[in-house]
Amino acid sequence: LSEFILKVETGSVYDEFDSIPLCRMTNNNLFQDGRLSENIERNRFPDVIPYDDTRVRLIPVKENLQGYINASHVKIRIQNTIYSYIATESPLPLTIYDFWRMISLNNIHVVVMLIGDFIENDHQICARYFPLKKENILRTNEFEIELISEQIRVDFIIRHFRMYTINGQRIRTVAHLQYTAWDDNQLPLECQSFIDFVNEVDCVRRYYGETNPCLVHCTAGIESEHTKCAKSDARTSNVIS
C-alpha cells in the first residue's frame, strides 16, 4: 500500500495507466456481435459494446436468435484463486428475460446493483427487473421471481429472491445487494459506507461460494463495476480493509 501511495504522490501511477495498450479499445473488429442489426436494440448505449471473445453467450431462443446480451466475463486471479465476475449494463425492458436467463445459465447467486434508483432526472436508467414487494411476483417468458426478504441499511439494501421456472420448479435463491448512495454521474460522497457495502457483498459471496460468478451492474456496465471488482480484490489481497 505504501508503494502505491508513493506512486500516486509522485504521479508515476498515471504514467502506468497511460502505458496500457489501446489496441483492443480502438479495434472495432473485436466487438462485432453487439453491432449486428438484431442486437443493437439490446445495448443501452451504442458506444458501449462487449468484446466478442469475453461476452456472455446465452442459449439462442426465438426472441434472441444470437443469444446476445451486453455483458462480459471478468476473471481476476488472486494468489491461487480465480474470482469470476460478470459485468453488465442495467437491464432494458427488452432484456429483463435475458438478464434472468444469464443468472440461471451462469449459476449466479449474488447480484450487485450499483444504482441508487431506477429513475434519475426523469430518465429511466434501469428497468424494474425484480419485484419490490413480497406479494408481487415478476414473471418473464420462462421464470418467476419472488421477493422473500429485504434488509434496509443506511446506504444499501440486501434482498433475497427465489427464482422458479414458470411451472413452479425452484431454481435457486439469489442474493441482491443494491448500493443506494451512488449517483449515476458521480462517485459516492462517503467512502466508508461503500467499503461496508463491499464487505457485505464479500460476506454473502463467501456464503454462496466464491468460485461462482458475481454479477455486477450499474447503468452502462463499465464504470462502477470496475470499482467494485477492484475494491473487492484489493481487500482479498489484504491491500485494504
Spans of features found by a protein language model:
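Cys-based phosphatases of the PTP/DUSP/CDC25 superfamily and their flanking regulatory architecture
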Residues: L1-S241
